């Protein structure tokens, strides 16, 4: 293959995007070189003599910031050693004009100048920028002078403590908060309560209102609930303001004349009349109302339906009674809707009261220790910048920032956009101390916004582009919108298939702005062969499961369709990487064909569930090198579970379960036969039986336990450092579980050190903290060894591979993932509150609309997730899926892709490699 020449049009766009004299908004397709453009712009700013301290480059993750910094510094370091001609070519490659001798001299000095500048070139996450800003102005921002930033683990610990203390105080004290807590627990159990509070804490800005009645009154207005209207009053109106209770028995007599259905309603009228008396208990009135409503409606909640009230024969005889009953049904239906609204208000008010108390205690916990969390950084920095004297703050911040660059702009949250607006407020008007232009640069792709759970607001991407363009244009400052559509990554055949999928029907909804057309991708590697395969979906067999036992929920067996797909993928990969196979990919360096390696392959899934584990198991059973999980749930990792068991057994050897676990672990290495020689028929504890045994293996175990017990009184780090180091624990664990376990071990040791920094060290307290731990480790898969990578799509964003498998294409995001809490607003800008609705049947009209909006947003992100996944592929894309007895949802990825490509001209039908019955659809270019 030949070296690919970048088209002149693309080079022109790159030069325009990196032009340091104008503000630019770049909309970049996947693989279109946005990182290159951003780095080139930074370098061109430096080439123009802009001080490094005047440049602020904000990225979404620490890894992205490190990658960006490495690109810039590596390039500048390289320039220090180049000859004049080579340096000229490198400078021009950034988009800058041909340099003169002075500029060449400056280019050679840029590396030293950038490194030696106090504070250096600022390429960081927005949270890191906010942290630095608050450290510089703690008094003005009203934060502790030497605050620390709490990581997720410590934040979760503070939140658990705040929740525990508030619940303990509330349960014993009574009062309004006790009643609110009781109202919440009437709706959910202990586990659901914990999840509910976590979800509520995502709306802390609402919970931290100076006066609690403010969000509650906003809630009332948002729901459209009139003052004074509550559940009790509405229910009284249901029973008393329509057909008078005194007439219920008369209507029962009338209905007795009709059919069996009429007579059932007659019985309900009598029961309602019987339980309606004065004085009456709350329970009796509830039974009365249930009977009365059952006459008019089938079922309860929002999904209940109005039913026929009189049979045709009875309607002819008593038309007036029928008219009266249908009018009553209409009246009751309106009151039921209002009751759902009042119930939503009552339920949410209780949640706001309890969650606000927990939020307040959580804030006190942090303040007492001089700690801020990540949300605080954004909130406090925004409050500081919104002050009337914020210009002075910005000027003092390295004597002003003249150039702001934003990477991954599609993942920026609403609050973060406000910070960016404050930072660049004077840029559009041309105000400031700098003699040169002050510029704003943003690059992103709304099609790749998949982090809504972290606050990303994809709809704001286009909105903010238009807003910045209007502001700079109004201030007579140059502003350009540059689209980058040329892919430097994927083969034209892969890109063509992706275009066809998203051009089809409404598939582009949520990927492009309203009324915008789909912009087809262009491929730089126009001669690179591409392949897309659609495998038939694996379905669960219909009929009764022939197995005589029930498997655990998280375990798949050979009969499960998900396991079948995992085996097929592993079988295909084994063929691809088999020595002597005729399968080839094209080398990125030589541009020629070479055999497929395991590291060329990326398997992407939506979630880390049973299929994720089944896929890794299938690869290992096929003896295919696999990099393991991309993210480790620390407390659930087997190595950490073994180490926790070792700690517990050292503190209390009589804990038979902990001791048995550690005896079978790699730390000691006994097997089932060894335990069977000890455990059955023992007179005392397992530890006593172990001590009494003369077996050499058992003696070795006792000696290890003795060494561990001698260290158990010290700090957790000393305990585990000795166990893993001098005692050989790390070596033994990694020998059995593989090098992946090393990441979990390192994180456990880091947490042990953090535990010592935060409190008086204690192994027992540390193990107690680990018991409720919700902490995961993100492993670096980009630099993984030559092994197949199995990752979630979120974790793979920014990565690429020669060959990509999408084996999990039948799942859909709704309604299982519906939130329980919905954000509501009023007609007044800035007025926001929340509403809690546990299930759809409880929804009032306003919440039903909010739920529908949330589902639409989830569907949009679901489609964007498919775009991100499919654009990771360079040469080959294999698509598979599995489902249960029922057909998959028509809106799932598998159906989207099949509908767009199944009838495509040139598609081939080939026999499946796993049997002689199924067929694969194949597109080759």
Over which residues does each language-model region extend?
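Walker B catalytic acidic pair
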Residues: 408
């Amino acid at each position: 293959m030949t070296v690919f020449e970048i088209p002149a049009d693309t080079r022109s766009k790159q030069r325009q995007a990196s032009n340091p004299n104008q503000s630019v908004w770049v909309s970049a397709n996947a693989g279109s070189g946005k990182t290159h453009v951003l780095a080139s712009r930074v370098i061109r700013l430096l080439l123009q003599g802009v001080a490094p301290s005047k440049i602020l480059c904000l990225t979404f993750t620490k890894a992205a910031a490190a990658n960006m910094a490495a690109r810039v510094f590596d390039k500048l370091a390289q320039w220090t050693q180049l000859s004049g001609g080579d340096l000229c070519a490198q400078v021009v490659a950034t988009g800058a004009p041909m340099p003169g001798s002075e500029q060449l001299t400056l280019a050679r000095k840029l590396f030293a100048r950038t490194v030696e500048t106090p504070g250096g070139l600022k390429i960081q996450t927005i949270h890191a920028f906010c942290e630095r800003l608050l450290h510089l102005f703690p008094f003005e921002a009203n934060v502790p002078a030497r605050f620390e930033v709490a990581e997720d683990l410590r934040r979760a610990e503070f939140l658990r403590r705040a929740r525990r203390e508030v619940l303990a105080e509330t349960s014993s004290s009574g009062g309004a908060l006790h009643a609110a807590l009781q109202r919440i627990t009437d709706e959910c159990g202990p586990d659901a309560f914990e999840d509910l509070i976590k979800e509520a804490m995502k709306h802390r800005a609402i919970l931290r209102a100076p006066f609690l009645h403010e969000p509650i009154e906003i809630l009332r207005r948002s729901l459209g609930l009139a003052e004074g209207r509550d559940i009790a009053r509405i229910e009284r109106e249901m029973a008393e303001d329509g057909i008078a209770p005194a007439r219920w028995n008369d209507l029962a007599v009338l209905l007795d004349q009709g059919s069996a259905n009429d007579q059932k309603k007659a019985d309900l009228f009598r029961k309602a009349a019987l339980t309606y008396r004065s004085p009456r208990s709350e329970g009796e009135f509830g039974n009365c109302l249930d009977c009365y409503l059952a006459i008019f409606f089938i079922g309860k909640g929002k999904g209940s339906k109005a039913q026929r009230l009189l049979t045709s024969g009875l309607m002819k005889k008593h038309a007036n009674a029928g008219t009266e009953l249908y009018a009553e049904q209409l009246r009751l239906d309106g009151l039921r809707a209002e009751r759902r609204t009042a119930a939503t208000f009552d339920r949410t008010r209780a949640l706001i009261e309890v969650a606000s108390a927990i939020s307040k205690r959580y804030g006190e916990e942090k303040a007492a220790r001089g700690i801020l969390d990540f949300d605080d950084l954004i909130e406090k920095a925004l409050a500081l910048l919104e002050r009337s004297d914020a210009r002075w703050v910005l000027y003092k911040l390295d004597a002003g920032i003249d150039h702001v660059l934003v990477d991954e702009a599609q993942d920026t949250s609403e609050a973060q956009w406000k910070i960016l607006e404050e930072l660049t407020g004077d840029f559009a008007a041309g105000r400031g101390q700098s003699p040169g232009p002050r510029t704003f640069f943003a690059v992103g792709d709304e099609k790749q916004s998949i982090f809504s759970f972290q606050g990303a607001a994809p709809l704001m991407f286009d909105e903010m582009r238009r807003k910045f363009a209007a502001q700079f244009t109004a201030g007579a400052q140059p502003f350009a919108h540059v689209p980058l559509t040329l892919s430097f990554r994927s083969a034209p055949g892969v890109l063509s298939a992706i275009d066809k999928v998203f051009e089809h029907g409404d598939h582009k909804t949520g990927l492009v702005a309203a009324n915008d057309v789909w912009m087809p991708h262009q491929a730089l590697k126009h001669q690179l062969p591409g392949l897309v395969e659609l495998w038939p979906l694996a379905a669960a067999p219909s009929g009764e499961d022939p197995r005589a036992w029930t498997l655990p929920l998280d375990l798949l067996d050979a009969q499960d369709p998900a396991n079948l797909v995992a085996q097929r993928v592993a079988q295909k990969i084994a063929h691809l990487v088999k020595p002597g196979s005729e399968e080839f990919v094209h080398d990125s360096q030589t541009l020629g064909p070479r055999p497929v390696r395991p590291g060329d392959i990326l398997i992407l899934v939506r979630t880390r569930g049973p299929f994720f584990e089944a896929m890794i198991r299938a690869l290992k059973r096929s003896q295919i090198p696999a990099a393991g999980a991309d993210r480790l749930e620390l407390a659930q990792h087997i190595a950490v579970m073994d180490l926790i068991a070792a700690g517990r057994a050292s503190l209390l050897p009589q804990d038979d379960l902990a001791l048995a676990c550690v005896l079978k672990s790699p730390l000691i290495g006994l097997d089932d036969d060894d335990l069977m020689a000890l455990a059955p028929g023992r007179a005392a504890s397992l530890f006593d039986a172990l001590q009494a045994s003369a077996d050499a293996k058992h003696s070795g175990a006792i000696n290890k336990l003795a060494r561990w017990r001698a260290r158990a009184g010290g700090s957790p780090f000393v305990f585990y450092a000795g166990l893993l180091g001098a005692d050989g624990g790390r070596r033994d664990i990694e020998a059995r579980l593989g090098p992946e376990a090393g990441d979990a071990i390192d994180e456990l040791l880091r947490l042990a050190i953090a535990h010592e920094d935060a409190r008086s060290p204690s192994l027992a307290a540390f193990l107690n903290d680990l018991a409720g731990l919700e902490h995961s480790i993100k492993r670096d898969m980009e630099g993984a060894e030559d092994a197949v990578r199995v990752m979630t799509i979120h974790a793979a964003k920014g990565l690429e591979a020669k060959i990509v498998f999408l084996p999990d294409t039948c799942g859909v995001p709704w309604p299982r993932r519906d939130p329980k809490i919905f954000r509501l607003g009023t007609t007044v800008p800035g007025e926001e509150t929340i509403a809690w609705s546990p299930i759809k049947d409880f929804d009032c009209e306003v919440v039903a609309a909010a739920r529908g909006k949330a589902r639409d947003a989830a569907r949009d992100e679901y489609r964007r997730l498919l775009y991100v996944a499919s654009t990771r592929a360079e040469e080959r894309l294999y698509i598979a899926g599995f489902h249960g007895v029922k057909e998959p949802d028509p809106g799932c990825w598998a159906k989207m892709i099949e509908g767009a490509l199944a009838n495509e001209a040139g598609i081939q039908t080939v026999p499946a490699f796993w049997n002689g019955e199924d067929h694969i659809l194949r597109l080759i270019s």
